[in-house]
Amino acid sequence: MSAAMRQRFDQFLHQKNCMTDLLAKTEAKTGVNRSFIALGVIGLLALYLVFGYGASLLCNLIGFGYPAYVSIKAIESPNKEDDTQWLTYWVVYGVFSIVEFFSDLFLSWFPFYYMLKCGFLLWCMAPSPANGADLLYKRIIRPFFLKHESQVDNVVNDLKDKAKETADTISKEARKAAVSLLGEEKKST
């Protein structure tokens, strides 16, 4: 690790939160530097993501659990900058999930897939202004969306209209069936 990266990693490990509190307690009880403890845990997680049973679940919990928690905290905070950061993450996460759905059948056979996926998601949620989500959104998703926005709006509006028509039709048919059923019950009594 370069000196600058090591310093940023060490600063991150000394921020005040529940994980660093746990690291501090572990460091105090064992006498082992929290950097080594964190790197050991990261190494074990990486090995588990390669060889462990349920690696998909663990990867999805990491990619969903922490971001969901900090998204709720962002919503409740008066600062709107963090809202934008996590909305950007969720847009990238959604696009990634759609792409992954179609490629998962092939990618899941790749031995390092879940470790790489987890690394990708951690890069997207990294606590820096130019994290992966921000980069992917600004360079790929936003330009694509702006180029095709009117077409996407048309498709969404058409789908919304068709869904409303279908819901209205189902509702009318359900009412007719209920009236018919009630009418038959009255005749039989």
Swiss-Prot record:
Its main location: endoplasmic reticulum. Keywords: Endoplasmic reticulum, Membrane, Sarcoplasmic reticulum, Transmembrane, Transmembrane helix. GO terms for biological process: endoplasmic reticulum membrane organization. Residues 1-34, 75-84, 124-189 are cytoplasmic. Residues 114-185 are annotated as: Required for dimerization and maintaining endoplasmic reticulum morphology. The chain crosses the membrane at residues 35-51, 54-74, 85-103, 106-123. Monomer (heart, ventricle). Homodimer (atria, kidney, intestine); maybe disulfide-linked. Homotrimer (heart, ventricle, skeletal muscle, liver). Interacts with ATL1. Interacts with ATL2. Interacts with ATL3. Interacts with CKAP4. Interacts with RTN4. Interacts with ZFYVE27. Plays an essential role in heart function and development by regulating the organization and function of the sarcoplasmic reticulum in cardiomyocytes. This is Receptor expression-enhancing protein 5.
